[in-house]
Amino acid sequence: VVGNTKTNDNVIYRELRIKPGELYSKDKVVRTIREVGQLGFFDAEQISPDFKNVDPNQGTVDIELGLVESGASQIELQGGYGGGGFIGTVGLAFNNFSTKNIKNRKAWRPLPMGDGQTFAIRLQTSTFYSTRSFSFVEPWFGGRQPVQFSLSLSSTKQYRYDYFTRRADKSQSFEIAGFNVGLAKRLRVPDDYFVLSQSISYQYYNLQNYFTGLFTFGNGESHNIAYNIALSRNNTFTNPIFPVGGSNFTLSARLSPPYSLIRGDDYADIAERPEYQDNSGNPIQAEIDQARYRWLEFYKIKFDGSWYTRLFGKFVLKAQTDFGFLGTYNSNLGNIPFERFYLGGDGMQQYAMDGRETIALRGYENGSLSSRDGSIIYNKFSLELRYPISLKPTASVFALSFLEAGNGFDDFKDYSPFDIKRSAGIGVRVFMPAFGLLGIDFGYGFD
């Protein structure tokens, strides 16, 4: 292996499918190129095996794998002025980090790199809102097996903002804090493209005099503990930014404990209990919902599948389908107001205080294909025709045209997979190592 000026040899060697002393296999050479390209540390278009000292009589050959390092770190600096005053963002993501060399002064050029770890921090603040997040990923936990360890921490606090006085009222606040810790293991059966991921996550929601209509209660707290499991298979090749073949799918489940079953309380008569009624005997909905949602009880099933096919020349067709369902173990509790799906728009508005998932469907306004309270079930289909303009390590650029269709529903009994809203449009994507993936789309919704 030559050309790896930053990445350590062992990070590359553990991805190789060709081993010294084995019989030559074209399939293993192709797989090696694919796996090294998927690391994201090298220019996938310039990974070139060089065959040397070919000896047909002895049945031996030397293979030299030529690599070109590409930037793996990203910097995010943003500043702006909006209706809520100044908003500043600082983010750093190091995608080829080395924790073992932190104490080695010589390794700080400018940072200790080369072990394939991911380390990211992000801070955002404004007059009434602040958030902090940290994440770390070790792709080979322990260094011997392809078991990925991940850890993330986050904290968000928002105050009620008065747009007339331009002041934040710190007596009215909403706070979220949480963590996620997980392991992901590369499987051998059915094949070694499969990965099984498992994690435990926890979010703490705390409302203090925060009556905004987002929830039916403005004082109280909620706890969201969930076990997350996902089975995925990714055999796309060769460039992770612009795949030209293969598929990538993920089937996942997010499960909370069945608290009502554990406690032996199904909440069927909660509105009739005196502690949840006013002096006139009328139920107090805010206190009822605070009791129902103190410990969030739900399950969530999702599927995401993408297929890439080279059509002719450099044109590549991407076909994708998405599905999500939020359910409840106890019908008396109903579906939680958190974790819901909001379909429509660019899908970029990830900031949300209620743990919602924004699902892009270009050609429509953000969230316009879901109700105000969010959908509990959705499906989406899309086709993209892509053409690469440049796939250089400094910047990868490709143009695309798309057809999309999807819809969100408030109840499973209303779900109809072909009752969908359609759109079409064009766009362009630009990937620069220092800034990540940038893009712009122009879409039109037909329905």
Language model features: what each stretch is:
Residues 22-242, 247-248, 362, 374, ...:
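Gram-negative/organellar outer-membrane beta-barrel architecture
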Residues 345-348, 353, 413-447:
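C-terminal beta-signal and terminal closure region of outer-membrane beta-barrel proteins
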Residues 56-57, 73-82, 213-389, 401-402, ...:
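C-terminal outer-membrane beta-barrel translocator/porin domains of Gram-negative envelope proteins
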Residues 18-23, 418:
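C-terminal soluble interaction/assembly domains
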Residues 6-20:
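N-terminal periplasmic "start-of-domain" segments of outer-membrane beta-barrel proteins
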Residues 9, 13, 26-33, 302:
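Extracytoplasmic/secreted envelope proteins and their assembly/folding machinery
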Residues 40-46, 254-256, 389-391:
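Long hydrophobic segments that form regular secondary structure
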